[in-house]
């Protein structure tokens, strides 16, 4: 797989897109609580994107062999690993939910962020999973440098996860961003 090396303008475009995606997460964070549905969160995210002049990369996205994705974001509750579809089931205390936001700026840059939320008091196992996942993410980020390979990132994350009694999901290994959703 080849990676397109971005120039300064491209990096600035990606940073702005990711900042805007993070802004969506910041705006919806106070609403992620018991009794709220992920469909309500999805609708709110669409309003935030419209107000900031971005649009969702996920709504209508159709990978080969699948129907178009219906949500403006992905909401993965509890056992759902990723790409959960927003639904009308209310969140409850003890749930964990990952919200994945991908925006497209008017200039065509994609920004992709996700954030994990603990709904009320969660189990010790859920809290541990969230904390170790966060630490694994930063360990992966620390591997990014000129000359490093994508495999270095994955290896560091996998070694860390397995060293703490967890595993990685081999079917989903991440993707790049730029002017294409899954660059």
Q: Language-model features: where?
A:
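Active-site neighborhoods and metal-handling regions in enzymes and metal-associated proteins
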Residues: 1-183
